[in-house]
Amino acid sequence: MYINDKEKVIKLTQELISTKSYSGEEDKMVEVLKKAFNEFGFDDYHVDDYGNIVGRIKGNRPGKKLLFDAHIDTVEVPEPDKWSVEPFEGKIIENKVYGRGASDMKGALASMICAASEFAKQTNRDFPGEIFVTGVVHEECFEGVAAREISAR
């Protein structure tokens, strides 16, 4: 099983990078993720009291839950003029994407969303249980606090 269209992963990664989401300022990122969950065929999503977003894909039989967890905040860019690329562009140079959050952890989040969607599509949802993809807030400044809200569910 593999992702058939890597361009989807790249484009989503670039969209996530281009959305500023400093700790405490993740609202725009949550809106981007709502749109992505809809476009990638997730059954639904939920935004909790902390601002975490949880997307869900249901299999066609009861079973266990699988969680892909990512944080959606980044540290600030104190001196953007010292960057060799625009921090919020998602520029591709020699097959690598650059920008704030590219490796921590917007690229991984895009991969999680695309992989979950592709798995559901390729299996025709013939799997037991549910797949969740989370976008957790405030990780850079309060690691684990907002994530505990998701764990409690």
Each predicted region: which residue ranges?
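Acidic/His- and Gly-rich active-site-bordering loop/insert found
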Residues: 1-98, 121-127
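Short, conserved acidic/polar surface loops in the N-terminal third of protein domains
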Residues: 77-81, 102, 144-146
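Acidic/histidine-rich catalytic neighborhood of metal-dependent amide-processing enzymes
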Residues: 105-153
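Short glycine/serine-rich loop segments
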Residues: 98-100, 133
